[in-house]
Amino acid sequence: MCSMDINRIRHILLDQGFRGCIQISNNKQPVFAQAYGYSDFPNQIPNTLETKFATASAGKVFVAVSILQLVENGKLRLQDTLGNILPLDWHKIDANITVEQLLMHTSGIPDYFDESVMSEYEDLWKDFPNYRIRTNADLCPLFLYKPMMYPHGTKFQYNNTGFVVLAMMIEAVTNQPFDICLQSNIFSPCGMNSTGYYEMDSLPAKCANSYIFEKARDRFRTNIYSVDAKGTGAGGAFTTVGDIEKFWNALLSYKLIPRKATSEMLRCHSGNKEAGYYGYGIWLEPTDSGYSPYFQGRDPGVSFISFYEPSENATITLVSNYGDNVWKLLRSIRECISGK
């Protein structure tokens, strides 16, 4: 990537008023990393490359890796069922849903936040206070008594409940909170020292506040009453752009799971042209030579995407604590990198 490319990328970010952090790496080496905007808007404290950002659904990829690690260690099988691993009263939910179906969003399990019906995550908390959500099990009342969305294994539909249940499986098999398991088996081995799941009312140092703009009142407010009090298997990890690069490097060099398991994770298992294509816990963009993997997340005041471009051996990570359109920025940056 030449200096002209980097200058053009800077102009793209400034022209679109980006607020957050970006890191672009080529051959595992950062070639551009920059922070914009404020982590604390009223006090004008700027974002930095050390700022920890909320990432919404991006955390599903960590849960998927953890599940595949347990499979490799013989503690789980992809064909294990919901009822087998979590022997609860599942009411109208089919206990024969498999681990694999949960991983690739074909389970049909009722979604506590069905993105095909609901547009705003904060609407969930009108009748159920968000401050109660501090574990995966805390979300059970929001889906446990609902009927199946469709027979398991018959279609692809992105589903948040599925990854909450996968995290509950991790907890059942390891006998520890899922975030502690992820810390021990993913974050620490990768050197991701600024990544974790934190309670919104006791955030550690260097965490960015996430802001929602209220047009009617012409002001920003934080999202503390709009998201879970602590992240779950569905998402909610805090991280830095540098830590995400460490994750990609470890994943793609088979330090987290073996080559065969990594290939299966990054292989297309479900999805379609309209909804998108999916591996295990990761999105896939079709290319002439295969697929480019990426993971992403959106919550009120939060937007995140991290994309791997195999043809360039490059990663691009964008995260905003103002919900900026990181997808539009990514398209512009990819065009810049490809020389279009």
Language model features with spans:
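Short, surface-exposed loop or secondary-structure junction motifs
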Residues: 93-298
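Short, well-ordered beta-strand elements
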Residues: 31, 304-322
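Short beta-strand scaffold segments in enzyme catalytic cores
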Residues: 21-24, 281-283, 306
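A short acidic/small-residue loop/turn micro-motif
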Residues: 38-41, 228, 323-324
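Short, gly/Ser/Thr-rich active-site loops of penicillin-recognizing serine hydrolases
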Residues: 30, 287-288, 324-340
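Catalytic tyrosine of NAD(P)H-dependent dehydrogenase/reductases that use a Tyr as the general acid/base
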Residues: 53-56, 156-158
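Short, conserved catalytic-motif segment at the N-terminal edge
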Residues: 2-55
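Active-site SXXK
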Residues: 28, 54-82, 166-171, 244, ...
